[in-house]
């Protein structure tokens, strides 16, 4: 989004100066240049009171006017907001281009503080009302953000906005399509293929698995790569398919704080199918009614998978994001000290080495760090989900899938590493159940339903595991052969 604003800034400020030989050269018809004001509200997030926010906003707007040589650098006696609106009021018709990046950062910074949210909203209302009052001076206004909040008034004051967020015409605007990747990055793909020692087709498969899959439009037919992650990979292919999600701003701390009190971050929700109404994605929401699934879609953790009528199915776009989401879940079910001690990275090593005992013992050690009051493991499903989160967060090179179907049934958890393919079957032992009987039942189920046999070309490891509700540990396990 920020790169798009940079493109607009150059076009309106300098015309085609920076775009000779590019497709826009034949499409851009405006021969005039304009005073371009670019506001980046991602700078307005470090505050704990409305007074601190007001001071931040006023100083930022004054600095913007000063940097653009629109007011004297000598301190004005006006607050920054009044000075900015006053300047806009003096401009000629259609002479100003306003670009507002991350408009909602001040609001998302206080998602978990409703009273502060409301005070910040009122302060921003004055700015947006000024835009509306003097919109005759504005030739073009483009705004980006994550969430849409109806009480901010930007969607009512500026009610002549065209919201392109879910329009199919703009579905590939903020990402690279497969065709674009193969057309414009062919040389980079060949270099990466050579450095990694894999065929170009295999390289594209891995890139798709890791960085593709984002869908931003209501027909659910266009999918694009994350530009940041793809470009980082192409710059340093020797690093392999690293996870760049957090580098692209994919883990705002306030999101974590907000979601801690919502059901979406219960372990059993990690792999569940999530559905929302199309209007929930398309329309602005009241703060008090903001749905956590919608927020996760707006922040990129979930993307549109399918649209049937007015119902939207959401899911993780790719491995990079599903791993990042697993880490977000791990942040919640384990406190930070527990994460630092838990050693999820060891899980990846044990899975790669095929060491079942070490794997189970490490899982049990991590379980000790889970807050039982907040996240009790009370069923086979919750155990499966917790283990899936641990494994998925342990390495970007490991893929975990729950309830994988074959012709005879569905296994609990299947895990792909570089060398091994694990198939796990769980049983949940309540206080008066026989652990040994449950273990043998899981072994029989694994054998009679042939779990994993369709993957005979892989180094297959199959294991049955019993979780004791009383001990809160996996107390029985066995590798299944034959």
List the predicted regions and their residue ranges.
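Active-site metal-binding core of divalent-cation-utilizing nuclease and nuclease-like domains
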Residues: 88-92, 396-419
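Mg2+/Mn2+-dependent nuclease catalytic core
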Residues: 117-122, 428-452
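Phosphate-binding site recognition
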Residues: 1-379, 394-397
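Structural motif
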Residues: 97, 420-422, 461
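Nucleic-acid nuclease catalytic cores
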Residues: 438-443, 450-478
